[in-house]
Amino acid sequence: MRKSVLLLVCVFLALPVIGQTTLNGAGATFPYPIYSKWFSEYHKLHPDVQINYQSIGSGGGIRQVTAGTVDFGASDMPMTDKQLADAKQKILNLPTVLGAVVPAYNIPGVSGEVKFTPDALAGIFMGKITKWNDKAITSVNQGLNFPDRDIIVVHRSDGSGTSFIWTDYLSKVSADWKSSVGSDTSVKWPLGMGGKGNEGVAGMIRQLPGSIGYVELIYALQNNIPYGSVRNAAGAFVKASLEGVTAAAASAPKMPADFRVSITNSPGKDAYPIASFTWLLIPAQSKNPATGKILADFLNWMVADGQKMTSALSYASLPDNVAAKEKDVIKQVK
């Protein structure tokens, strides 16, 4: 009898959850920590809903949502007019949080915070500044003893929204960069070594003395990698923080109706200059009504209760006016 009861229990546990809905998404690594938190918390509230997410990079997220192979995509770069036209249906670009991309480094013998000018960052990533003791670096870092050591540049190897934010910033502050490299999720880098994902770049910086790369703030914090302050458009050196990112959004251009906006190099005196929104890419018409209803419910939860979880992971929450506009647009999701 005891064996029979045990057998029935095992059979019951092996059965799938009746009525469970699974949503699949893919895209940016930049917001993965907060997305992972959100999907987990939403599942606790709605055990019948499972949201899976692959952090494969913004380029992959755009490709997959365009092809219709996922229920939603994610990108740190809003889709272009051409990408939206190529999609099989209307795609909504919905901002979720704001974050910062930071110049993270591994400089032996330098323990203080390093300051970077826009010209120095552009020069390093173009290969024009090759030594850590170059005057372009030392002149604004009095008191720090930089080694006569080669600079190793680390960049993303995959299509990346983090790369777009970085190159969008460099294109705004350096005419040479804009004309020779430009901005995109994937560019022809003048030099350097490639790492896959924010995780890959962070790992390479940790392993390579003399290196510098760019990662989303939380990846520098989680990996205990030093990162520098950057001189903003107002002339102040600002280190990435929730306050600096929020200031960047506050002083940025007015949010357009489709939410596609860049806030890099914002003019505010307290603004961190390499900041950005990140977006979920949501089909206005889902494959079936049940999926659309769940997506809309999650999005409404995300712009309200979900925003309360952002600061713990070093993201800035959406400005109230943006969240309010977004709630109106979410009504289009079916």
Predicted regions and their residues:
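Flexible loop/hinge segments at secondary-structure junctions
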Residues: 19-334
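Positively charged n-region of N-terminal signal peptides that target proteins for export
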Residues: 1-4
